[in-house]
Amino acid sequence: MVYVKRIELSHFKSFGGTTAIPFLPGFTVVSGPNGSGKSNILDALLFCLGLATSKGMRAERLPDLVNNTFKGNRGSSEASVSVTFELHDGENLSEPGANHNGNGNGAKISKEWTVTRRLKVTKGGNYSSNYYINGETATVTELHEQLNELRIYPEGYNIVLQGDVTRIITMNSKERREIIDELAGVAEFDRKIVKTKETLTEVQDREERCQIIATELERTLERLAADRQKAEKYQALRQQVQEKQGWAKVIQYKAVEQQRQKLWGQLERDREQSQQIQQALDQRSQAIQTQQTELEKLNAQVKALGEEEQLAVAAQLATQKAQRDQLQQRYNDGDRQITNHQQQVGQIQAEISQSQQQFLHIQQEKSFHNTQTLPQLEAAVQTSQQQLEQLRHQAQAIASASEAWVQEQTQLSRTVNQLQDELIPQRSQLAQLEERQQQLLTNLAELTPLLTKVSVELEEKQFAQGQFNFQGEALTSQIQTLASDLAQLEQERSLLQETQTRLLKEQQEKQRQLDKLEAASQAQQEVQGTYATKVILQSDLPGVCGLVAQLGQVEPQYQLALEIAAGGRLGFLVVEDDGVAAAGIEILKQAKAGRATFLPLNKIRPPKGQNPNLSYAHGYIDLAVNLIDGDRRYADIFAFIFGNTIVFDTLVNARNHLGKHRIVTLEGDLLEASGAMSGGSRNQRSGLRFGTMVSEDTAEVKQLRQRLQDIQQVQGRNEELLLERTVRSRQLTQQLMEMRQQQREAQLHGEQTERDIARLSQQQTQINQQQINQQQKLAELQQNLALLQQSLPPLEQQLASAQQQLTALETSQTHQQWQTIQIQIRTVEAEYQRQLQALRQGEDHLKDLQNSSQRLEEKIAQAQEKIAQHQAQDLTLAQEQEQLKIALAEMNGAIQTTEAQLAKLSEKLGSTKQERDRLETQLNQLRSQQQEQQWQWEKLQTNQQEYQENLTQLQTQLEALEQDLPDPWPEIPLLQDRDEANLDFANILEELERSIRNGQKRLEAMEPVNMLALQEYEKTEARLGELSEKLQTIAGERTELLLRIENFTTLRRRSFQDAFDAVNKNFQIIFAELSDGDGYLQLDDAEDPFNGGLNLVAHPKGKPVRRLSSMSGGEKSLTALSFIFALQRYRPSPFYGFDEVDMFLDGANVEKLSKMVRKQAQQAQFIVVSLRRPMIEAAERTIGVTQARGAHTQVLGIKL
């Protein structure tokens, strides 16, 4: 928590020396007598942190803050204040002057942060003030930047003085609303709006300049249009003459060509006939040769057709059938593989079932073995062991009778028994070890491929997990980007929607205002009669010439006089005839649009009168009708309007002729012939003027129309952007949903893969551990096996030797009882050994059952994996079978085609002989015709030589004419759709030359012609097109700037409304706690808050609802304090200072205020200057302040 830890004052106001005042977090009260300087502590805070001016610290000038009893060297004085803050752990502040680009590279400082301000005053009254941060010089701007990082704001309410409460009470509602403006940052939006409006003004200026240029270009185009039209006509006529001259050359050439063509036609006909004969001869020769060749082929074909081609087609057919058989074989193999796989799957499933049955049988056998077999074998071993002990006791009793023999026999028997007892376990152990060794080797051989398989699968899963992790990170990044883009897009869309709604409301309001103004204007026009004329002009009635005011132009110096003289007659409608006037009257009746006066040109008669000769009179200008510039056809109209009205310069000069004539002055004074005079001051005229339409809109109407037009443009652009944002938002939402679905799928795959990796890792670890254990066991077993194999042979030799000695002893001297007992002992021992061996075999069998059970489980798992592999292979084979079916169908079609070809060849062989005989007959006929045509060709060659000599002469003449022919030849309309072979080109040429002479005369008549007008018009038109495109671009920029202004306006309103709602909510809560009543903030204009002010409305307990202005002094203070607390809660700071804000409150309200401060002190440090007991008692600590000997302020004590 940041808080003020210490304030050190040196010669500041009432503090004469250097005084350090420590503070702690929480609620501290500074108290002391009036005038003791307790409020100077808060002034010191304001001074040091630069939060107030000198007047805010109750001083006229800064030098007044220096203690007047302190003088330094050379008569100068100095005051300083240092404020030390305790920073929260991890709180960072940038160094003064460091870059504030938000890169987080600000220097970390210690937990204490000290601000010092020194004020030096020279002897002459000049002063300087310097700020220091941790001993380093800083500017006030740098200080405020770092204070902002600590949430201490110069414009905030960190320190509330007595005047602040009074100021809130006395300020008007608009100033009170501006407090919320400042909190909401409205000024920043205002600056942006002003800057954008400046840019908009520049764009509008550019648009106006371009519009002026465009208007000038349009006028230039209109001026060039006539010259361009004349130049185009001249150019077209000149092109026609030149074109006809080309036609004449062509027609002259065609006349000679016509003669040549006739001769050439005869020659060509002979040539064609000769060529036809020659071609016929060549064709017949070729036909003879062809038929001769074909005949030879048929002869050869008859011989060879039955063998070669038929064999080739048959071979092709055999190849195709072989390919079909191969495809069929592959298809059958695929079916067999699928069938085999299905059989194998069935076998594997049967094996799985069998293995499961075996597994169940083994489990049952294990259970039976554990519960019945082993307990029975253990009981039998115990019984045999007991019988053996009894027999041995009997043998010892018999042995006492024959001591020596028995001792020797006993010794040998004991030796044999000892050796047997030693050998039998070792032999059994050897067998067990050998069997166990085989089991271990088998287990190790099974574990190695299983470990390899698990390792490979584990690597695949780990690789897949890496892929899933990478995919998940990529998807997470993409989702974050999309979510950020979508959130930004939604903010933009919300802003656009809010702007659109606000503009719609404004549009409706502006339209209502415009409708009211237009209705009022229409009522005024109806009174003046101009509304009826507007209806007629807008009805597009044929024959309406316009208003009198529109039909003439007047110089500006005479305009006022003539408009006064004409009066309301300027609004009369001029029409072609009385029929048009009648139609106009009928329209007015139907529309109920009022009345109008029509002046039909065919009926109007000007008043008759004498032309007064007053040119001699002083100030005389002219007759009013002579000062109008207009079409002569409207002369009677203007004569009817003005009559004999005379224009004078001034009223003084006009008065000399009063009562004689109707006179108007340049200043607008009107003197009637009857002697009546009218005049006076001139108001802003809104009626008709010469050269204008019916009436002009007022500035307010123009402003409303322009605003509505701007709103419409902005709405159009806003709707486009809103639609774009909506479409883009839907796209991003869809993409985000798809990405999240992909992320969920990847996450599920990843989690499954993690479980598989954990399972495989555990399985790998278990297999490795099993391998290590098995290898250790195998090593130990092999070591024990080696020891046994070394120790068994000597023992077996000893046993054989002892058994031989015992046999010899027993055969040498037989003792019936001893032998009998020994036989019984050996029988019982053999039975004992057999039962003991059976017990050990039962235990080994149990171990075998356990191993078999484990192997069966592994076998079942492997079989299930094989089933999955076969099913995957069957799916691949089924796809290949479909492809083979398609290939077989295509091959069968090819085989059918080949078989049909082979059948046709077989049929053709029979008809070949008949074709050969027919060709021999045709060949003889062709040779006879060839001889007859040869004689005709020789005759035509003689005629062609005569024609060729005549053509040479005509060709020379054509070559001379060809030099002047145009290239390429033009199309001649005179010759189109006509047969040139039957035309008389001489008559056509004469008529064409006559037309050329007429065209040349017309060209001479049109000269001179400005041919440059064509290029100038095109250049001007191109420039106007470029300028139009530029105007469209500027209009787009203007719309974008308008939309930006509206968006800033929306954000400005939104920011204010958010701040207002939050402060209002805080005010309601705090006021309820302070006064046991209810209160709220009220805007004068909720629809447009910036158009009004802010009122504090309170309802103290037991009193009616009142505004701030109608409350008592205490209620005002309590309400103002509630407002200040609400502002502080909206923008919290680490510390606050109050200077006797409770002085106008009674005891009960002071107690409530102190509770509120104590509650707020849980979140921030409060330093309160107060003399009231409830405030002092509520504080966590109290600092006492007094005047030391009536001179300097002194801190007497600190109550902690």
From Swiss-Prot:
InterPro entries: P-loop_NTPase, RecF/RecN/SMC_N, SMC, SMC_hinge, SMC_hinge_sf, SMC_prok. Keywords: ATP-binding, Coiled coil, Cytoplasm, DNA-binding, Nucleotide-binding. One of its GO terms (biological process) is chromosome segregation. ATP binds at P33, N34, G35, S36, G37, K38, S39, N40. GO terms for cellular component: chromosome; cytoplasm. SUPFAM superfamilies: P-loop containing nucleoside triphosphate hydrolases, Smc hinge domain, Tropomyosin. It holds the Pfam family SMC_hinge. It is found in: Cytoplasm. Residues 202-528, 692-1046 form a coiled coil. Residues 90-109 are annotated as: Disordered. GO terms for molecular function: ATP binding; ATP hydrolysis activity; DNA binding. Residues 542-656 form the SMC hinge domain. The keyword Nucleotide-binding applies. Contains large globular domains required for ATP hydrolysis at each terminus and a third globular domain forming a flexible SMC hinge near the middle of the molecule. These domains are separated by coiled-coil structures. Belongs to the SMC family. Required for chromosome condensation and partitioning. Homodimer. This is Chromosome partition protein Smc. It comes from Synechocystis sp. (strain ATCC 27184 / PCC 6803 / Kazusa).
